[in-house]
């Protein structure tokens, strides 16, 4: 998520978890499931997305099921950050638990597909490097930023448990 | 200022006298429920990595419902892992292939007003029908609960949905929720607590209240909740549980809500939601001649005993239309037994229904009854997202069990009231 930014993959409102992690592949290994991530709305996404690319979406991203494979598939494909107008609540929790930065960023729907986008989670700023536009995101609760810095809830708990021992 | 019911439960679980919306607090979890898909197979590697066990096996309920019964080597392996993990961790409350978790949990007396409950499934708000604060989490969140017995929560505001009047004949809780989704939208709940109030709610049976809270998920709410009353207490007692002090778990009259939305049950017509969103709902009369390949009565939302009774009321003495297949998957094995005992199953099968195992099945695109490309289904389930029930180009319409049964008989969308005794 450095100065070069990543390519923006832009989606609309109400992207559901069946689209992110289709039920037909839920019992398959994550590498196979991830190949079908978002294929219903963009068949080229899974094959084309590169590590460091950014998913940009409208309202209510990740609505539907609690399956965290919806987040895991994005992480598996190298996505570190999703910026959206708003998130579904369970997806939002799952994202931080798996070390995916989820930033609520009103107006971000104006970003164009293929633009270069840089996300600064600590500052809460999204920059469109292709157009020069910037957006301020809603602040992330401190305990969730701690979790993302640790790489997710499991490494975060590992630290906590180690400190106790 | 007083507190809402949701705030009172969260305050108690957080060990606080009071909480306010927006605060982030850590709560002790009274009960954690998970299933075979998001449960043991996902939390096992996390607990192993952490070298940790389950904080309190008595407070964990595991239900196998997603991959049941096994149909291939993969689903068999998932169920095998589920059984071995629950045994290894001393989880006594393991319901293996006995129905869908959201229905089994209250059916076996695990829910009691005032409890703070997490469930590893998005339809976990169903438990709110019993005056619990119950919400869905993903597997890593669940693993955190299993290790620590705690979880964090941002105290939600309460959004009240106030239903006046009484539902008419052939109209059900499912219709109430489809109409609500159409009015408020798929994020109208904004991850807050949706509380159902009013005369129409007071007159509903527990299974119908469960349908309301279940589909709070479709509003994007964190949970749905209904204050407990005598109906709640009677259900819990019959299930072998203890309702406790239901007077304690009521919201204060002066508690602040974010908003109150008023609805009229008297004038509500049967609803149908067109593909691919529950929010695409409209009264049944708004549809023209929409024909179906399949009618599906199943899932936590639409296959409880009352749901089967609704379907049977329409199907009694009638036959499923030629070219339509009617599939019925009762929500639990106990419901199947009750429906067998009271003659409901005979009515359904005489009409031509094919009975399927009790489980999540085709609702989640996992079990028997998934759709081929281009097929069209009408379903009593909760979600009709593109591709969810099988092929990407399949279309799913959502409706009540009454309306699904009417469509099975007519072969197209039809008003169920024309098929009920004294109707037409």
Model-derived features with residue positions:
Chain B
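Fe-S-dependent hydro-lyases/dehydratases of central metabolism
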Residues: 1-424
């Amino acid at each position: 998520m450095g100065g070069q930014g990543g390519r923006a993959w832009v989606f609309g409102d109400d992207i559901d978890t069946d689209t992110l992690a289709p039920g037909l592949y839920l019992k398959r290994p994550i590498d196979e499931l991830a190949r079908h991530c978002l294929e219903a709305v963009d068949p080229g996404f899974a094959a084309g997305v590169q590590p460091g690319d950014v998913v940009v979406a409208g309202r209510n991203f990740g609505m539907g099921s609690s399956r965290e494979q919806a987040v895991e598939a994005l992480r598996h494909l190298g996505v570190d950050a999703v910026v959206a107008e708003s998130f579904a609540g369970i997806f939002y929790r799952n994202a931080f638990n798996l070390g995916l930065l989820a930033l609520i960023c009103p107006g971000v729907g104006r970003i164009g597909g293929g633009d270069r986008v840089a996300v600064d989670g600590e500052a809460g700023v999204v920059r469109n490097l292709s157009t020069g536009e910037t957006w301020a995101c809603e602040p992330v609760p401190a305990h969730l930023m701690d979790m993302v810095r640790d790489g997710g809830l499991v490494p975060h708990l590992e630290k906590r448990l180690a400190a106790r021992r | 200022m007083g507190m809402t019911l949701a705030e009172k439960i969260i305050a108690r679980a957080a060990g606080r006298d009071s909480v306010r919306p927006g605060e982030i607090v850590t709560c002790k979890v009274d009960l954690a429920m998970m299933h075979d898909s998001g449960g043991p197979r996902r939390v096992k590697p996390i607990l192993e990595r952490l070298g940790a066990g389950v904080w309190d096996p008595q407070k964990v309920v595991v239900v196998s419902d997603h991959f049941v019964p096994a149909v291939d080597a993969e689903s068999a392996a998932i169920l095998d892992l589920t059984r071995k993990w629950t045994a290894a961790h001393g989880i006594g409350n393991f319901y293996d292939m006995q129905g869908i978790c959201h229905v089994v949990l209250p059916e076996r007396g695990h829910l009691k007003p005032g409890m703070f409950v997490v469930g590893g499934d998005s339809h976990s708000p169903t438990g709110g029908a019993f005056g619990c604060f119950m919400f869905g989490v993903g597997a890593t969140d669940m693993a955190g609960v299993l290790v620590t017995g705690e979880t964090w929560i941002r105290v939600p505001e309460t959004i009240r949905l106030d239903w006046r009047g009484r539902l008419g004949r052939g109209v059900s809780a499912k219709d109430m929720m489809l109409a609500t989704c159409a009015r408020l939208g798929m994020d109208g709940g904004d991850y807050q607590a949706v509380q159902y109030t009013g005369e129409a709610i007071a007159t509903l049976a527990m299974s119908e209240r469960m349908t309301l809270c279940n589909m709070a998920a479709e509003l994007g709410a964190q949970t749905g909740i209904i204050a407990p009353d005598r109906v709640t207490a009677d259900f819990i007692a019959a299930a072998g549980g203890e309702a406790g002090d239901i007077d304690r778990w009521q919201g204060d009259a002066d508690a602040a809500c974010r908003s109150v939305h008023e609805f009229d049950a008297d004038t509500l017509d049967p609803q149908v939601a067109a593909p691919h969103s529950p929010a695409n709902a409209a009264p049944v009369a708004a549809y023209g001649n929409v024909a179906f390949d399949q009618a599906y009565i199943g899932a936590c939302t639409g296959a409880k005993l009352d749901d089967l009774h609704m379907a049977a009321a329409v199907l009694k003495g009638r036959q499923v239309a030629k070219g339509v297949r009617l599939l019925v998957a009762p929500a639990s094995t106990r419901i199947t037994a009750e429906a067998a005992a009271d003659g409901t199953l005979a009515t359904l099968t005489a009409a031509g229904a094919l009975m399927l195992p009790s489980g999540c099945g085709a609702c989640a695109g996992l079990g028997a009854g998934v759709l081929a490309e281009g097929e069209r289904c009408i379903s009593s389930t909760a979600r009709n997202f593109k591709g969810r029930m099988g092929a990407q180009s399949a279309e799913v319409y959502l409706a009540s069990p009454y309306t699904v049964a009417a469509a099975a008989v007519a072969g197209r969308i039809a008003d169920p009231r024309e098929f009920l005794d004294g109707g037409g």
